[in-house]
Amino acid sequence: MAWRTTLVKTQLLNTEWRQRQNRRTLVFRDHFRSNRNKFTLALWTLFSLTAIPGSLPPSISVEIKAQANPNDRVTERRDMVVRQIRRRDVTNPLVLSAMETVPRHRFVPNDASLQSRAYADTPLPIDQGQTISQPYIVAYMTEALQLPPNARVLEIGTGSGYQAAVLAEIATEVYSIEIVPELATTSRELLNELGYDNVHVRMGDGYGGWPEEAPFDGVIVTAAPDHIPPALIEQLAEGARLVIPVGETYQAITIVTKQAAGSSSEVTLPVRFVPMTGEAER
């Protein structure tokens, strides 16, 4: 009889163990279901930081795309950074983060053909015969500034406002000058709409800079003069950089570093920008 009693006790213990396991399974399943979106997003982030582009499992990619707002175009921005920028030796994490954050398509005209190329590595036409620079050049010039923490930056040539938005993700204050009144107005309105309240846009001639707000921790020019405007060097803080495309038919990005004993310059990358207008025309 003792073995029968033991058998009954064993059966009862097994039954209780199964019941506990079933309860745990139900709790885990409910918890997993309620947190599935968080889990998937975390997994997507892990893969995006470590995997080769295109290597994500299709099931994960499809689920993320279904949950994302199609107007955000987040995946396109991520691909732009990975394929066009990081692979070409732009490595500053603040610059990469800014390029992945700013919605470039919002700064491109609302035309189907142009919108389809909003994240292609190419300049695109905007209003008033001007262009929005290709993403790689924006990232390259931003990184070349080597901005310190809490930087104050001067931009010459607001254009669409895209470069200013990228700078605003990194710098504390951005001062941007646009000589075309229509572009100054539209870029200011769009930047305000997107929440970039640390960008200050004014209409004016960029050759003279913005002396009231000098000195700056960096100056960037997004149109090409045939010479470097002296005022822009004067308005640099000591140790700060001016990044500017220089030339007429053939242009190259020139980096000028202001030093106590003067300034030094380095010519780096051949480029093609729209001409800088203003003082030089008079």
What label would you give each PLM region?
Residues 40-57:
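Bacterial N-terminal signal peptides
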Residues 13, 21-23, 33, 69, ...:
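Compositionally biased, intrinsically disordered low-complexity segments enriched
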Residues 146-264:
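Conserved nucleotide-cofactor-binding alpha/beta core module
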Residues 60-154, 165, 170, 185, ...:
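Class I SAM-dependent transferase core
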